């Protein structure tokens, strides 16, 4: 028997409930003149009302009213208003059951509604079985089926029938896909795949498990471990059309299942399923391993360059005393010479009476040496890391299938020469004419190509970052052009906030920019800039003072005293079946273990319900990144619907910031050292927090990564982010590229720029700018470049909006482009225009500054809550894999969201109780009450759950 699709009560309600919002009522329940004509043929008011109601419900949600069903007041009011009837007129409808059936029969005849039976049902079943391959979840296939029933005017069958049909369709689709993949495998490849479950690697684990144990590293040993696996997989020559016609989400699901099965579990699967999972894993792991190799190479290059920088800095630090003494000696000699010149004494006598000419020569030689030390270049020391590259680079270049854009073809030729061993230090056409590498390469001995090899590998790293060089099969380092939205699809998408013609955008921005510059000039002359001034071409901005009303702090403390302890509930779905987890308490233990940074083994000791292996099983099959995202979205949506949340905002603005977490070992997963946070390796959780305090998005990024490219990820990769219109961030989160992308996509980007006075404005006509502002103008906007590249700019923005590629991936590549890349430069020009408009708004609008400050304060307070939640293991993230780190951060963020939801709900109840008691609280005071408190929550101890 096929498994049944188990829809949750929430999912069933979403499919079958009657609409209640004004928008949905207008869309689905507006009656036409024809409808009103049929309705008016009923003589009695209650029959007219009931006939109209049944018509509307048959159209949407597409079902029959159940006997005695309670109709929402909004529906009664909306339909009654169109008929001139009231709620009382519906009371007597269908006193006779026959009346309701007669009306249903008449509606089927008038409008062509049909029951789910006969040929129509067979056609729908055939359609459903074809459509099932594209469904991404149980809820998705049910939604597709319901939508098709509505389109064909087929009355929805019972919920149990829908679940049974969808279950059968999903099982059939799964088996068809598995059979399709397995049938494309030659016998020799089948034998190689099945051998993965029998062979062992390192006499410890099966080859199958060994192959999936990989993470990017930061040294040559890590690179070689990755290359061992990649080389092994490349010997399995899978057919090129293996996955043709298989939806991407089906491929991803098969891979994820393969990453959770052990060899014993795989052997127990049906043969087609086993082969399909093995083949998909081999195909996907090849691309993932290639990406991991490139990432590891990137880290090795970065570590070598930083080590070379440290050598330079150490030399300067070691010579600090000598520099002071040398400068002091020159100052003394110079002073004596100046005095002698003034007194008319021979200068030679002054030198002779001092340290003498020999002493002066020694001093000059010392100064020359110190000058060389102070000007030391890290490239002088990169040759010390040559041995690192020799351990893995030849294999890497042999195994990676590289392609290049025309601008990087000279580099690809140099890579080919390096791969084949024909090292020719004269091949330097891949270097820019102004590159410092030329000077260092000329200084090498004849026949010594080691530095040239390092130069090639350094530039290969940069080319991967910018996308000028790519891999033929890759997730992160593929050809970006293949992912960009076609130019002809931009107009159809309608998701961009700018005109399609560059002339229109330029004319609008020039008019706005000229007007705002004049306004700023007038304010500067009149001295009316809020909290600031422009004096002698220098901008001065004072820090805003706190604006919390009197009594806000006391109110917060008073309200929190009345909140009861917190309990946490949530549910995830099974990776393969899509069914909710039946063991809800076990699942809550797993989520809690991740969120408080305790780990499953210690959670098993701290709970009274589950063993470690039970928690492991639940975690492997029910906990994944997408499940955390779905759960977070549910909590955020529920919190936004609470009345108390409206005192803090409307969910249309947000702030984002990175939070550093210490990790245990450097070079594993995303663990890197960022000098800003000391010498301890770690990672950053980059989170978005709405004006209602909801942490609606979070992702793990390397500690050394710039935060700016990740701003749009949180806004575009989930529904809550798409409601945001104004985005705040701190200084580290802005670049001109981000300004441009946000403006094109319709977001107002408002970063708090710490060094704002040092930033320059840009104008279309700098000479026409007000005189007070000309010292602030940094240059002229290049209109011609924007016009030439406008179609490609729109393609990039449309691709970001479509979600086919993560915005951060595109923005990182643009930021890594060489200076001569015109597209990156054109997008920067657009960003300069938008940044100039924003800076003028910021200078003239104190309220904007205050909103940004409030938004960023909410984000920083949210960091404190997460820090309190993750108190176990001293707050260190000790997971060794990127996936484990992501789950740890996602669990932490989910717990924070649940606490915020609970606090919001209970604070609302407290406020409502005080209102009933006659104590009215000012909305201005309530706006300063935060749901981020945790003092009333007992986070540690023994976790005892009631027996189910």
Task: List the model feature ranges, each with a label.
Residues 526, 533-606:
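Structured, charged N-terminal subsegments at the starts of enzyme catalytic cores
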Residues 2-4, 8-20, 25, 557-578, ...:
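Eukaryotic alpha-helical scaffold "rod" segments
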Residues 89, 605-646, 673-791:
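Catalytic or ion-translocation cores adjacent to nucleophile or general acid/base/metal-coordination motifs
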Residues 2-551:
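Long amphipathic alpha-helical coiled-coil/heptad-repeat bundle
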Residues 637-672:
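Structured nucleic-acid-interacting core domains from mobile-element enzymes and related host factors
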Residues 32-40, 572-573, 580-586, 636:
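Short linear interaction motifs
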Residues 775, 781-948:
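Long, compositionally biased intrinsically disordered regions
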Residues 62, 603, 654-660, 727-732:
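Short, conserved catalytic/metal-binding motifs centered on acidic residues
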């Amino acid at each position: 028997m096929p498994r049944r699709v188990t829809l949750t009560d929430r999912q069933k309600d979403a499919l079958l409930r009657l609409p209640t919002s004004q928008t949905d009522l207008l869309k689905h329940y507006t009656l036409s003149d024809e409808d009103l004509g049929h309705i008016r043929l009923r003589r009695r008011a209650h029959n007219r009302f009931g006939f109209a109601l049944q018509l509307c419900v048959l159209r949407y949600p597409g079902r029959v009213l159940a006997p005695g069903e309670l109709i929402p007041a909004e529906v009664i009011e909306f339909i009654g208003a169109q008929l001139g009837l009231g709620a009382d007129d519906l009371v007597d409808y269908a006193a006779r059951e026959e009346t309701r059936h007669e009306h249903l029969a008449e509606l089927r005849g008038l409008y062509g509604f049909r029951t789910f039976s006969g040929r129509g049902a067979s056609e729908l079943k055939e359609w459903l079985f074809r459509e099932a391959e594209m469904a991404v979840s149980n809820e998705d296939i049910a939604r597709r089926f319901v939508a098709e029933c509505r389109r064909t005017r087929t009355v929805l069958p019972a919920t149990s029938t829908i679940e049974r049909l969808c279950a059968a369709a999903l099982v059939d689709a799964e088996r068809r896909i598995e059979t399709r993949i397995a049938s494309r495998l030659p016998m020799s490849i089948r034998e190689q795949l099945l051998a993965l479950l029998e062979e062992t690697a390192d006499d410890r684990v099966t080859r199958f498990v060994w192959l999936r144990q990989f993470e990017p590293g930061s040294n040559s040993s890590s690179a070689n471990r990755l290359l061992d696996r990649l080389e092994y997989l490349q010997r399995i020559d899978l057919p090129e059309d293996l996955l043709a016609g298989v939806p991407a989400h089906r491929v991803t699901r098969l891979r994820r299942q393969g990453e959770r099965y052990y060899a014993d579990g795989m052997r127990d699967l049906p043969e087609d399923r086993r082969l399909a999972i093995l083949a998909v894993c081999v195909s996907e792991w090849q691309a993932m391993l290639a990406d991991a190799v490139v990432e590891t190479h990137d880290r090795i290059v970065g570590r070598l360059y930083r080590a070379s920088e440290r050598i330079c800095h150490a030399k300067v630090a070691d010579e600090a005393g000598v520099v002071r003494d040398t400068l002091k000696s020159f100052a003394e000699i110079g002073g004596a010479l100046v005095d002698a010149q003034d007194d008319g004494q021979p200068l030679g006598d002054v030198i002779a009476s001092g340290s003498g000419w020999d002493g002066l020569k020694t001093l000059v030689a010392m100064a020359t040496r110190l000058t060389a030390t102070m000007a030391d270049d890290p490239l002088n020391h990169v040759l010390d890391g040559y041995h690192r590259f020799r351990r893995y680079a030849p294999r890497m270049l042999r195994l990676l299938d590289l392609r290049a854009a025309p601008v990087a073809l000279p580099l690809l030729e140099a890579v080919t020469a390096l791969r084949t061993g024909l090292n020719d230090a004269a091949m330097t056409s891949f270097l820019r004419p102004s590159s410092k590498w030329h000077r260092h390469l000329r200084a090498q001995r004849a026949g010594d190509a080691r530095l040239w090899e390092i130069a090639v590998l350094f530039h290969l790293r940069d080319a991967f970052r910018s996308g000028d060089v790519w891999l033929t099969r890759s997730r992160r380092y593929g050809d970006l052009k293949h992912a960009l939205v076609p130019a002809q699809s931009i107009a159809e998408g309608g998701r961009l906030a700018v005109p399609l013609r560059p002339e229109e955008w330029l004319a609008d921005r020039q008019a706005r920019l000229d007007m705002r510059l004049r306004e700023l000039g007038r304010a500067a002359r009149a001295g009316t800039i809020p909290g600031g001034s422009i004096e002698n071409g220098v901008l001065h901005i004072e820090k805003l003072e706190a604006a919390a009303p009197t009594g806000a702090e006391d109110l917060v403390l008073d309200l929190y005293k009345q909140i009861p302890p917190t309990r946490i509930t949530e549910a995830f779905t099974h990776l393969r079946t899509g069914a909710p987890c039946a063991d809800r308490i076990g699942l809550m233990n797993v989520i809690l273990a991740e969120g408080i940074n305790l780990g499953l083994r210690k959670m098993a000791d701290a709970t009274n319900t589950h063993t470690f292996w039970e928690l492991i099983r639940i975690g492997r099959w029910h906990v994944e990144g997408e499940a955390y995202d779905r759960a977070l979205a549910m909590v955020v949506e529920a919190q936004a619907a609470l009345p108390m949340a409206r005192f803090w905002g409307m969910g249309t603005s947000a702030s984002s910031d990175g939070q550093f977490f210490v990790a245990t070992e450097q070079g594993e997963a995303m663990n890197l050292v960022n000098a800003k946070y000391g010498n301890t390796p770690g990672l950053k959780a980059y989170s978005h927090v709405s004006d209602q305090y909801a942490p609606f998005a979070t992702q793990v990024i390397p500690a050394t990564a710039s935060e700016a490219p990740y701003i749009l990820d949180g806004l575009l990769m989930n529904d809550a982010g798409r409601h945001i219109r104004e985005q705040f961030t701190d200084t580290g989160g802005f670049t001109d590229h981000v300004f441009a992308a946000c403006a094109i996509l319709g977001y107002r980007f408002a970063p708090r720029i710490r060094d704002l006075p040092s930033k320059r404005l840009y104008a279309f006509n700098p000479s026409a700018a007000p005189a007070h502002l000309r010292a602030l103008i940094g240059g002229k906007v290049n209109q011609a470049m924007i016009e030439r590249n406008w179609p490609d700019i729109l393609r990039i923005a449309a691709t970001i909006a479509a979600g086919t590629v993560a915005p951060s991936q595109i923005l990182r590549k643009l930021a890594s482009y060489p200076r001569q890349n015109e597209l990156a430069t054109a997008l920067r020009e657009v960003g300069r225009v938008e940044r100039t408009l924003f800076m003028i708004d910021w200078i003239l609008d104190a309220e904007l500054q205050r909103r940004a400050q409030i938004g960023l304060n909410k984000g920083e307070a949210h960091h404190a809550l997460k820090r309190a939640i993750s108190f176990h293991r001293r707050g260190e993230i000790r997971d060794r894999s990127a996936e484990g780190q992501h789950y740890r951060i996602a669990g932490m963020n989910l717990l924070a969201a649940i606490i915020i939801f609970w606090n919001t709900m209970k604070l609302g109840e407290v406020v409502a109780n005080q209102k009933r008691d006659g104590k009215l609280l000012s909305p201005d005071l309530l706006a300063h009450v935060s749901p981020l408190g945790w003092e009333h929550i007992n986070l540690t101890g023994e976790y005892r759950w009631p027996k189910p």
